[in-house]
A protein has these predicted regions:
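Conserved ABC ATPase signature
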Residues: 139-143, 147
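ABC ATPase NBD coupling module
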Residues: 57-59, 69-84, 111
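Hydrophobic anchor residue at the start of the ABC signature
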Residues: 153
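Catalytic Walker B motif of ABC-type/P-loop ATPase nucleotide-binding domains
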Residues: 164-168
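Q-loop/switch helix immediately C-terminal to the Walker
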Residues: 89, 97-111
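Conserved catalytic motifs of ABC-family nucleotide-binding domains
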Residues: 160
Length: 214
């Protein structure tokens, strides 16, 4: 599903030597990439999410493919339907144009022009997986940090991506909520044939839920 071979990304106007990435994983499930702050985790997550070149201008060398397509070649409409990235700050990922959690989770699937019945089914499944049903009619602006983080993950799940990238996406959750979500996401990935890549600083508790780690 994701392959990087001697892959380097050099941002526009960068004065630092680029990181070199080697990564290959093609099976469904959950894997993790660990690294300290400043190690290039978030940049790698954004590259795997297909942000180059539209949102990550610069130059790339080496080989990189996402779901069989070279990095930078996947059309935006296909990319949004197959790859989702959830980052550490949930508030920055809300659309800002909805009045309830239900509308927020529906926003992505509606932009795929799906049938209303399919959209509602995706909303129900995503809210159930993330334990967000009680938040369904709440305004996104009234949510706590942990609640917002679960809603943003629900939005990504509702898109039913083949590749889901979670970049420190559990930072505001309680240990109990984090453990619940990790278990459910692992099961979801295996059931749907999708790949989840976690980007985290600390091994615990994420390593216990992953098939492989780097």
């Amino acid at each position: 599903m994701v392959t990087l071979e001697q892959f380097r990304y050099c941002p526009t106007h960068s004065t630092h030597p680029p990181f070199c990435y080697d990564f290959h994983y093609v099976k469904p499930g959950m894997v993790a990439i660990f690294g300290d702050n400043g190690s290039g985790k978030s940049t790698l997550a954004q590259l795997m999410a297909g942000w180059y070149p539209d949102f990550l201008p610069g130059e790339i060398t080496g080989t990189g493919t996402l779901l069989g397509t070279p990095i930078g070649r996947l059309p935006l409409n296909e990319q949004s339907a197959t790859i989702q990235l959830v980052q550490q700050s949930p508030y920055l990922q809300l659309s800002g144009c909805t009045f309830s959690v239900e509308e927020e989770v529906a926003f992505g699937p509606e932009n795929l022009c799906l049938a209303e019945k399919e959209i509602m089914a995706r909303i129900d499944a995503a809210l159930a997986l993330t334990e967000c049903q009680p938040l369904r009619h709440r305004h996104p602006a009234t949510l706590s940090g942990g609640e917002t983080q679960r809603v943003v993950i629900a939005c990504a799940i509702a898109m039913q991506p083949k590749l889901l990238i979670l970049d420190e996406a559990f930072s505001r959750l309680t240990p109990q909520a984090r453990e619940m979500l990790l278990q459910r996401l692992q099961h979801w990935a295996l059931e749907r044939g999708s790949l989840i890549i976690l980007f985290e600083r600390h091994h615990t508790p994420f390593l216990n839920h992953c098939q492989q780690a780097w």
